[in-house]
């Protein structure tokens, strides 16, 4: 099905302004999912914050209980010893300090996540212009600067997603693959939303979770009725 036809098919199945129970929203998306690859199911959450204010920016990470369906390559900056061994035992593809930095500067950037122990940030700091634009710079707010690199690696590989409000105060995130069953997708979305609620800025007023929409990789969004979710 051509993309334009798929978009029209989803649009035709969605009543303007209507919020659908989660299961119904996912059914609409899966019915129209005809890509030659397994599409992701993504969520957009509009928050009741003013993203222009530094104290209302929402940033963090969530470990999705059903995972993301993606294979994740992880690099860890940690000094030789217990921390490095811990990261390797957890499944990190690369662990090092200056040697790892040199490899990255030479073009080895085939990683989805970069983690660092606090004492390794002196090395990582030199890679800011390299890692920053790629969204790979370790940050304590999303759990990628950690004194427990083994745990951080396990989280990254077991389905950790990172989020940050954009200029329109919207969070964009994946909650799995279209091949996931509905309960897996639902548990992932609920875990994300619960963490977003925990991250609510103290200065945010009014309705916080203003709108939740789900979409497939190639399709438009379908608004989810939040009452169909368990957010307590």
UniProtKB/Swiss-Prot annotation:
Q: Return the Pfam families for the record.
A: Ribosomal_L1
Q: Which GO terms describe its molecular function?
A: rRNA binding; structural constituent of ribosome; tRNA binding
For this UniProt record, give its keywords in alphabetical order, as a comma-separated list. Answer: Repressor, Ribonucleoprotein, Ribosomal protein, RNA-binding, rRNA-binding, Translation regulation, tRNA-binding
Q: Give the top-rank taxon of the lineage listed in the UniProt record for this protein.
A: Bacteria
This protein's record includes keyword Ribosomal protein: yes
- One GO biological process term: regulation of translation
Q: Name one GO cellular component term.
A: cytosolic large ribosomal subunit
What's the stated role of this polypeptide?
A: Binds directly to 23S rRNA. The L1 stalk is quite mobile in the ribosome, and is involved in E site tRNA release.
- HAMAP family assigned: Ribosomal_uL1_B
Indicate the quaternary assembly.
Part of the 50S ribosomal subunit.
Similarity annotation: Belongs to the universal ribosomal protein uL1 family.
Give the protein name, as stated in the record: Large ribosomal subunit protein uL1
> Which organism was this protein described from?
Xanthomonas oryzae pv. oryzae (strain KACC10331 / KXO85)
């Amino acid at each position: 099905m051509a993309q334009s036809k798929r978009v029209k098919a989803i649009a035709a199945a969605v009543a303007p302004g209507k919020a659908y129970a989660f299961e119904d929203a996912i059914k609409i998306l899966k019915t129209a999912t005809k890509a030659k690859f397994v599409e992701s199911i993504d969520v957009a959450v509009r928050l009741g914050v003013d993203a222009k204010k530094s104290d209302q920016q929402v940033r963090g990470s969530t470990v999705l209980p059903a995972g993301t369906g993606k294979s994740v390559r992880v690099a860890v900056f940690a000094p030789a010893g217990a921390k490095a061994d811990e990261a390797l035992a957890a499944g990190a593809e690369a662990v090092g300090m200056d040697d790892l930095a040199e490899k990255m500067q030479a073009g080895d950037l085939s990683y989805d996540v970069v983690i660092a122990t606090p004492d390794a940030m002196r090395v990582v700091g030199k890679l800011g212009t390299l890692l920053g634009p790629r969204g790979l710079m370790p940050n304590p707010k999303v759990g990628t600067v950690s004194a427990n690199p083994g745990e951080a690696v396990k989280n990254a590989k077991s389905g950790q997603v990172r989020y940050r409000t954009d200029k329109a105060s919207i969070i964009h995130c994946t909650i799995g693959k279209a091949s996931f069953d509905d309960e897996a997708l639902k548990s992932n979305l609920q875990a994300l939303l619960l963490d977003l609620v925990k991250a609510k800025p103290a200065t945010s007023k009014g309705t916080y979770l203003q709108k939740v929409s789900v979409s497939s990789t190639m399709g438009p969004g379908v608004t989810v009725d939040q009452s169909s979710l368990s957010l307590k």
